[in-house]
From Swiss-Prot:
Protein name: Queuine tRNA-ribosyltransferase
Cofactor or coenzyme needed: Zn(2+)
Keywords per UniProt: Glycosyltransferase, Metal-binding, Queuosine biosynthesis, Transferase, tRNA processing, Zinc
Domain of life: Bacteria
GO MF annotation: an example: tRNA-guanosine(34) queuine transglycosylase activity
EC number(s) from the headed UniProt entry: 2.4.2.29
Function: Catalyzes the base-exchange of a guanine (G) residue with the queuine precursor 7-aminomethyl-7-deazaguanine (PreQ1) at position 34 (anticodon wobble position) in tRNAs with GU(N) anticodons (tRNA-Asp, -Asn, -His and -Tyr). Catalysis occurs through a double-displacement mechanism. The nucleophile active site attacks the C1' of nucleotide 34 to detach the guanine base from the RNA, forming a covalent enzyme-RNA intermediate. The proton acceptor active site deprotonates the incoming PreQ1, allowing a nucleophilic attack on the C1' of the ribose to form the product.
Top-level enzyme category: transferase
Protein species of origin: Synechococcus sp. (strain CC9902)
Region annotation RNA binding: where it falls in the sequence: 246-252, 270-274
Active site, renumbered: 92 (proton acceptor), 265 (nucleophile)
Annotated substrate binding sites: 92-96, 146, 188, 215
Length: 372
């Protein structure tokens, strides 16, 4: 039911392209996944989302547990039917949100007790509970409940988080019973190379259908993130999809693909869109800027998204300056399409044997003027 096929390798890097098969269809890799935290990508319908070329969508267990509750989603027939998306889906376990957003009362070997920010009630989140919620939601891929340490953190604190993450992973595996849902483990370890290597080996030993690298994009220097991906890549199974969590800039994705990463997710494209910013090439354009007022050309003539094929820069500028919701939707659609096109282009370059040449500039500090 779950199978990962690699169709080509880059001869000069660790980059590869392939296909991850799920019950709701294939996911061509490398691939960017839009984030639909509450069973919706903000401001975008599922029909519009499909036009971006997105194949797999991420939702969040923590937020869906709080609202509307997994029982409501299960009664609707699962997450796919609830939101009207018939493609592959992944649910994050909510571990990151529990530790970053929740008002923690207690964390111990059993799990986490935190206060619901909506109504103040106490929630006891254990690995078993997080797994049961995700089984009720019914996405194609569920993520193991993990402890994501903040940055910076002491070595002892990160070591404790790794120990809990590995122990909790075993409990998630034992609790997970849906054969039509894959469970991915998550590598932690902060910016400590030896802890990252230990975690990679520990998680890989569970022989799960896929593996993720967590605890990045939490404030650490970019070079540290690149080193983490480079160092632990050789320790991960070659025949399983590798998912780098929370990453969505062009440079970071190019570096990650060169080191054998297959899947990415990030709120960046929609967050930028909601603030009037468009991704064009390697640049970020603020469409509120007066220079777009009389510019009647498409946002990006090479892009086939709804914003670029039907509207001008001047019109989108007008929408943003007028605080019209359509402007935010158009920019969000464009930005998602932009990242999907970028990962598609990397896959094609790997197939054609020119990835290391064509995408080397994107791994530099300032790739703004490069195209693909």
């Amino acid at each position: 039911m779950f199978n990962f096929e690699i169709s080509a390798h880059c001869p000069h890097t660790k980059g590869r392209c392939g296909c991850f098969h799920t019950p709701h269809g294939p996911v061509q890799t490398p691939r960017f996944m839009p984030v639909g935290t509450l069973a919706t990508v903000k401001g975008i319908s599922t029909e519009q989302l499909a036009r971006t070329g997105a194949q797999m969508v991420l939702s969040n267990t923590y937020h869906l547990h709080l609202q509307p509750g997994e029982q409501v989603v299960a009664e609707a027939g699962g997450l796919h039917r609830f939101m009207g998306w018939d493609g592959p889906m992944l649910t994050d376990s909510g571990g990151f949100q529990v530790f970053s957003l929740g008002n923690l009362n207690k964390i111990d070997e059993r799990g986490v007790v935190f206060r619901n920010p909506r109504d103040g009630r106490t929630i006891d989140m254990t690995p078993e509970h997080a797994t049961n919620i995700q089984m009720a939601l019914g996405a194609d891929v569920a993520m193991a409940f993990d402890q994501c340490p903040p940055y910076p953190a002491t070595e002892n604190d990160v070591k404790d988080a790794c120990r809990r993450t590995h122990a909790w992973l075993e409990r998630c595996v034992n609790a997970h019973t849906r054969s039509d849902q894959a469970l991915f483990g998550i590598v932690q370890g902060g910016c400590f190379p030896h802890l990252r290597r230990e975690s990679a080996r520990a998680v890989a030993a569970f022989d799960l259908p896929g593996i993720a690298i967590g605890g990045v994009s939490v404030g650490e220097p970019t070079d540290d993130m690149h080193r983490i991906v480079r160092d632990i890549g050789p320790l991960l199974p070659l025949d399983r999809p590798r998912y780098l969590m929370g990453i969505g800039t062009l440079r970071e994705m190019a570096v990650a693909v060169a080191n054998g990463i297959d899947l990415f997710d990030c709120v960046l494209p929609t967050r930028l869109g909601r603030h009037g910013t468009a991704l064009v090439g390697g640049e970020r354009w603020n469409l509120r800027n007066a220079r777009f007022r009389n510019d009647h050309t498409p946002l990006d003539s090479s892009c086939s998204c709804l914003a670029c094929t039907g509207h001008s820069r001047a019109y989108i500028h007008h929408l943003i300056r007028s605080d019209e919701l359509l402007g935010l939707t158009l920019l969000s659609l464009h930005n998602i399409t932009h990242l999907v096109r970028f990962t598609n282009a990397m896959a094609q370059a790997i197939q054609d044997g020119c990835f290391s040449e064509d995408f080397a500039p994107w791994q530099e500090d300032s790739p703004a003027h490069h195209t693909w």
